């Protein structure tokens, strides 16, 4: 087991494969183990670093709120701890929010970026999803102890009794309003957006997000010379809750990360 002491946190990470680095950031209430079905594909030619975020998986919680900005600082510090100058970063849902804030606040440590099932504004979620996020409380956590999600958490958490605290902190984080549109428009790292065709994100917002990255604004020309540096993928037959295990996603990510750098 590997831990990095960063920002007062003992941050757990697991490494797989060798090659150019790729940091993986899981979704809410999960851990790096969520990527298990696609890890062999992602690590075939790369050094994959699967992280457990604050209070998740094998990373114990500390006395600070959950905030995208502080978790982004943890990831930037981890990249430095590992002796890396830069790394590709891929996140899903909560982890994609952290990845997005990492490239915004610490652009010097991010090479290419893959964001899966995440909005850049809070109203990018379907309204009922945004409302449900406000229901994460200690009491909700207690009720969730009968779920497979809790079983996976309790199996690896340093302090399983922190499950209720995690729910309270997640509820607070996910209730905060945010709009990162102006920051997104300034991102220069090649970025791939990936969504399910039955996602928790509004389809119109997916297109708006892509446009902020310079995508979908014009035809790419017959030779593709005017295509944007970023990519947008919508995976058929997937949802917000299973897209990260789709073999098609792993194949798309691998191709995106290996593609020649876009021209000026």
Where are these regions (language model features)?
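Catalytic active-site module of serine/aspartate enzymes centered on a nucleophile-bearing elbow/loop
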Residues: 220, 225-264
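Conserved HGGG/HGGXW glycine-rich cap/lid loop of the alpha/beta-hydrolase fold
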Residues: 9-60
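Short beta-strand/loop motif that positions the catalytic acidic residue
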Residues: 187, 193-195
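Active-site nucleophile elbow and catalytic-triad environment of alpha/beta-hydrolase enzymes
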Residues: 167-183
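Acidic catalytic loop of the alpha/beta-hydrolase fold
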Residues: 198-202, 240-241
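Flexible "cap/lid" loop of the alpha/beta hydrolase fold
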Residues: 97-105, 110-150
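Conserved alpha/beta-hydrolase "acid-adjacent" motif
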Residues: 200-208, 217
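Active-site loop/oxyanion-hole signature of alpha/beta-hydrolase fold enzymes
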Residues: 49-90
């Amino acid at each position: 087991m590997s831990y990095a002491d960063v920002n007062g946190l003992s941050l757990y990470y697991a490494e797989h494969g060798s090659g150019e680095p790729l940091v993986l950031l899981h979704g809410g209430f999960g851990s790096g183990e969520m990527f298990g079905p696609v890890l062999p594909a992602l690590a075939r030619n790369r050094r994959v670093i699967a992280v457990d975020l604050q209070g998740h998986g094998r990373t114990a919680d500390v006395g600070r709120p959950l905030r995208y900005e502080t978790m982004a600082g943890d990831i930037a510090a981890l990249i430095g701890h590992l002796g890396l100058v830069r790394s590709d970063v891929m996140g899903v849902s909560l982890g994609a929010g952290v990845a997005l804030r990492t490239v915004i606040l610490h652009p010097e440590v991010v090479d290419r970026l893959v964001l899966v099932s995440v909005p850049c504004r809070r109203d990018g979620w379907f309204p009922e999803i945004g409302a449900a996020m406000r229901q994460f409380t200690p009491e909700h956590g207690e009720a969730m102890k009968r779920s497979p999600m809790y079983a996976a958490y309790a199996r690896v958490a340093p302090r399983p009794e922190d499950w209720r605290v995690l729910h309270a902190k997640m509820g607070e984080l996910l209730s905060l309003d945010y709009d990162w549109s102006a920051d997104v428009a300034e991102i220069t790292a090649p970025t791939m957006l990936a969504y399910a065709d039955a996602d928790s994100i509004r389809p119109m917002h997916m297109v708006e997000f892509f446009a902020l990255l310079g995508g979908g604004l014009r035809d790419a020309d017959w030779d593709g010379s005017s295509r944007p540096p970023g990519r947008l993928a919508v995976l058929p037959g997937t949802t917000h809750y299973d897209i990260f295990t789709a073999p098609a996603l792993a194949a798309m990510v691998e191709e995106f990360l290996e593609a020649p750098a876009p021209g000026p």
